Structures are given as C-alpha cells and as structure tokens.
Swiss-Prot record:
Transmembrane segments: none annotated. This is Ribosome maturation factor RimP. It comes from the Bacteria. Keywords: Cytoplasm, Ribosome biogenesis. It is found in: Cytoplasm. One of its GO terms (cellular component) is cytosol. The lineage of its organism: Bacteria, Bacillati, Bacillota, Clostridia, Thermoanaerobacterales. Pfam families: DUF150_C (PF17384), RimP_N (PF02576). Belongs to the RimP family. The keyword Transcription does not apply. Coiled coil: none annotated. GO terms for biological process: ribosomal small subunit assembly; translation. Required for maturation of 30S ribosomal subunits. CDD domains: YlxS_C.
C-alpha cells in the first residue's frame, strides 16, 4: 500500500466504523493524464449511492485538511462490484458455497484457471469442489480469486 493509500485509509476509517461499512480496498493510480484515488466500500446488504456520497464528502473534507496529495486528482468512492476479487478472509467466508474462479501463477495439470464451488478457506488454502472432487490450492500459488457471476 502506498503512502497516500495508507493516509486515505486512516482518514476514512472513522466514518466507515461509525456506519458499519467495510473498507474493501484503496487505490491511488495514474490513468492517462489523471490521478485517481479510489475507495471501495461495502456493507451487509450492499452499498447505496447515499452511502458513497456520505463517505466521499467526509473523506474529501479530511483530505483537504491534511492535503497529502500535491497535484490534482479525482476522488471516487464506490462499491467494489459483484465480480470484485476475493482478498480478505471475510471475502472468502462470505462466498462459501458459491462458485469462484481461481487463477494460478503456474499451471497445475496444464491449467492456470479452475472454477468450482468454494467449500472451505483456511487462510493459507482454498478448497473447492471441482468436477465433483475436492481440490486444494495454496494461497501462495494463487494470483487471483473472483466470484463467478451467473445471470
């Protein structure tokens, strides 16, 4: 996490805790000629536009007071979306029993992607039901995990 991302995280936590929101991620990056500070939040039942506005206004005021960013930037506060990557233990726990896609750094059985039902997460292992069989993956070998969205 960059210094600016850490500052934004520290500044936003009081309003998140007060409203029982979860901080999913903070990103500070340049896209084209613009810098973006993105804050992704969530809560049980989902985030609303009013929730995003509340957090955005609060964080904007705090950032103006501290002024940690020397150049212009765009502040965005949003929900992480349905297909957000699973990163934290809570993300995995929330998705037990659901379909996920696992991407690996190196292939296993000539495959780098596996899709199956998440049946267990131990912190250092992901266990899915893949083709009717239990399959384990060490987190150190996993590059990305995301939910499978079916409509």
């Amino acid at each position: 996490m960059s210094k600016i991302e850490q500052i934004a995280k520290d500044l936003v936590m009081p309003v998140l805790e007060k409203n029982n929101f979860e901080l999913v991620d903070v990103e500070y990056k340049k896209e084209g000629s613009h810098w973006y500070l993105r804050v992704y939040i969530d809560k049980e039942g989902g985030i609303t536009l009013d929730d995003c506005q509340l957090v955005s206004e609060y964080l904007s005021d705090r950032l103006d007071e501290v002024d940690p960013i020397e150049h212009s930037y765009i502040l965005e506060v949003s929900s992480p979306g349905l297909d957000r990557p699973l990163k934290k233990p809570r993300d995995f726990e929330r998705n037990i029993g659901k379909e996920i896609e696992i991407s690996l750094y190196a292939p296993i059985d000539k495959r780098k992607k596996f899709e199956g039902e998440l049946i267990e997460f131990t912190g250092d292992k992901i266990i899915i039901l893949y083709n009717g069989e239990r399959k384990e993956f060490d987190m150190k070998n996993v590059s990305l995990v995301k939910p499978v969205i079916k409509f």
